[in-house]
Amino acid sequence: MASSSLLLASVVVAAMVSAVSCGPPKVPPGPNITASYGDKWLEARATWYGAAKGAGRKDNSGACGYKDVDKAPFLGMNSCGNDPIFKDGKGCGSCFEIKCSKPKACSDKPVLIHVTDMNDEPIAAYHFDLFGLAFGAMAKDGKDEELLKYVAGDGDVVEVEIKEKGSEEWKALKESWGAIWRIDTPKPLKGPFSVRVTTEGGEKIIAEDAIPDGWKADSVYKSNVQAK
């Protein structure tokens, strides 16, 4: 019975989004959420799309360029974010804690979600359009009034650099779109490469030899480092 109730309420939420998707913006987006905002809770709105317990398509490149978002580290707990959350791609991979604002109707327990795509539905200053799995983990009855909290930790990336083995020079990459970064160079670069990421708060995170010699395109290499 609880599962049926959740599914029904989720469909109602999705219908509300459809009703406001046409015409000029109804609610302007709020200011960008930054690392300096702190741990205050903000009022937001959450909607749901896809299968009731969906974790996203296997090849869900979206606006961030991620794939296999149903697998680690995302595990389907993902969301599209509007402008102040997506931030022209710089919000890709950011983590948020979200919870329902009505304790009697919801678990009132924060759940962790990742930003993997964008949305432009003008329904709230802060709008999360969640995968079904993430939505169900948060709300028992699908209430669309939510509170959100920026997770402690500075995760928005503003610069990515790489360094060849044996070199002291860090070479800056250019942001192509979303979470996709590239480097244009007249000569081949030789791995392994160390990667240095600068966050919005100024933290520099270095992953030594994160990309091996003989690397291949469309491959994943784990760094085992993260923002504090």
From Swiss-Prot:
Chief place where the protein resides: secreted
Q: Which cysteines are joined by disulfide bonds?
A: C64-C92, C100-C106
List, for all copies, the residue spans of the domain called Expansin-like EG45: 61-172
Give start and end of each Expansin-like CBD domain: 142-223
Entry-linked CDD domains: DPBB_EXPB_N (cd22275)
Recorded GO cellular component terms are: extracellular region; membrane
Q: Does the keyword Disulfide bond apply?
A: yes
What Gene3D superfamilies does the record tag this protein with? Expansin, cellulose-binding-like domain, RlpA-like domain
Q: Where in the cell? A: Secreted, Cell wall; Membrane
Signal peptide interval = 1-22
What InterPro entries does this protein map onto?
Expan_Lol_pI, Expansin/allergen_DPBB_dom, Expansin_CBD, Expansin_CBD_sf, LolPI, RlpA-like_DPBB, RlpA-like_sf
Q: Which UniProt keywords apply?
A: Cell wall, Cell wall biogenesis/degradation, Disulfide bond, Glycoprotein, Membrane, Secreted, Signal
Its record classes its membrane topology as: Peripheral membrane protein
Listed under GO biological process in this entry are: plant-type cell wall loosening; sexual reproduction
Point out the glycosylated residues in this chain.
N32
Physiological role: May cause loosening and extension of plant cell walls by disrupting non-covalent bonding between cellulose microfibrils and matrix glucans. No enzymatic activity has been found. May be required for rapid internodal elongation in deepwater rice during submergence.
* Similarity remark: Belongs to the expansin family. Expansin B subfamily.
What is the protein name stated in its UniProt record?
Answer: Expansin-B13
Organism encoding this protein = Oryza sativa subsp. japonica
Species lineage: Eukaryota, Viridiplantae, Streptophyta, Embryophyta, Tracheophyta
